[in-house]
C-alpha cells in the first residue's frame, strides 16, 4: 500500500510543478555566468570612453523587447537568447580579434557559449510545453535590427578603437538589461 501512495504523491507533485510553473528554471550558475560576461566585457575596455565622446551614437536599444508587463517568462528567455547570440556573433568577428587580447575574447566567447547552451535547453523545454515558437517576431526583429545597427556602425567607422569602445559599452548595456530581466523573473519564481 505504501508504494502506491508514494507513487501517487510523487505524480501529484510532478503534475503541480508542471502546471504551476514554466518548465525551465535557469540554474543559479546562469546568473553567475551573466555577471562573468559583464565583467569580461568590462575588462575589454581599452580606450577611455571620454576620448570617444565624438563617436557616441544612439543605437535605439529596443528596451521594450526586454520589458513591459505583457512579456511572459518564456518570451523573455527567447529575447535573452537572441541578445546573447548576437553578442557572441559580434565578438566572434575578425574585427574584434584585431581589437582585443585573444585570450580575453576566448573567455568571453566561452562564457557566452555556455549562456547559449543554457538558454537553448530552456527554449526547447518551453516550446515542448507550449507547443509553439516562443519569441514574438517583433521582439526578435527589434533585437536583430539593433545589432545590425551596431555592425553597420563598426563598418562605417572602419572598426576604429573608439567605434569598438562605443559598441562594447552598448553591448554591456544590452546585456545588463537582459540580465536584469532574467533576475526579475527569478525573483518572481
Curated annotation (Swiss-Prot):
<dbReference type="InterPro" id="IPR000471">
    <property type="entry name" value="Interferon_alpha/beta/delta"/>
</dbReference>
<feature type="disulfide bond">
    <location>
        <begin position="24"/>
        <end position="122"/>
    </location>
</feature>
<dbReference type="GO" id="GO:0006959">
    <property type="term" value="P:humoral immune response"/>
</dbReference>
<dbReference type="GO" id="GO:0009891">
    <property type="term" value="P:positive regulation of biosynthetic process"/>
</dbReference>
<protein>
    <recommendedName>
        <fullName>Interferon alpha-C</fullName>
    </recommendedName>
</protein>
<dbReference type="GO" id="GO:0002250">
    <property type="term" value="P:adaptive immune response"/>
</dbReference>
<dbReference type="GO" id="GO:0002323">
    <property type="term" value="P:natural killer cell activation involved in immune response"/>
</dbReference>
<dbReference type="GO" id="GO:0002286">
    <property type="term" value="P:T cell activation involved in immune response"/>
</dbReference>
<keyword id="KW-1015">Disulfide bond</keyword>
<dbReference type="GO" id="GO:0005132">
    <property type="term" value="F:type I interferon receptor binding"/>
</dbReference>
<dbReference type="Pfam" id="PF00143">
    <property type="entry name" value="Interferon"/>
</dbReference>
<keyword id="KW-0202">Cytokine</keyword>
<dbReference type="GO" id="GO:0051607">
    <property type="term" value="P:defense response to virus"/>
</dbReference>
<dbReference type="GO" id="GO:0005615">
    <property type="term" value="C:extracellular space"/>
</dbReference>
<feature type="signal peptide">
    <location>
        <begin position="1"/>
        <end position="23"/>
    </location>
</feature>
<comment type="function">
    <text>Produced by macrophages, IFN-alpha have antiviral activities. Interferon stimulates the production of two enzymes: a protein kinase and an oligoadenylate synthetase.</text>
</comment>
<keyword id="KW-0732">Signal</keyword>
<keyword id="KW-0051">Antiviral defense</keyword>
<dbReference type="GO" id="GO:0060337">
    <property type="term" value="P:type I interferon-mediated signaling pathway"/>
</dbReference>
<dbReference type="GO" id="GO:0043330">
    <property type="term" value="P:response to exogenous dsRNA"/>
</dbReference>
<dbReference type="InterPro" id="IPR009079">
    <property type="entry name" value="4_helix_cytokine-like_core"/>
</dbReference>
<keyword id="KW-0964">Secreted</keyword>
<feature type="disulfide bond">
    <location>
        <begin position="52"/>
        <end position="162"/>
    </location>
</feature>
<dbReference type="GO" id="GO:0005125">
    <property type="term" value="F:cytokine activity"/>
</dbReference>
<dbReference type="GO" id="GO:0002312">
    <property type="term" value="P:B cell activation involved in immune response"/>
</dbReference>
<comment type="similarity">
    <text>Belongs to the alpha/beta interferon family.</text>
</comment>
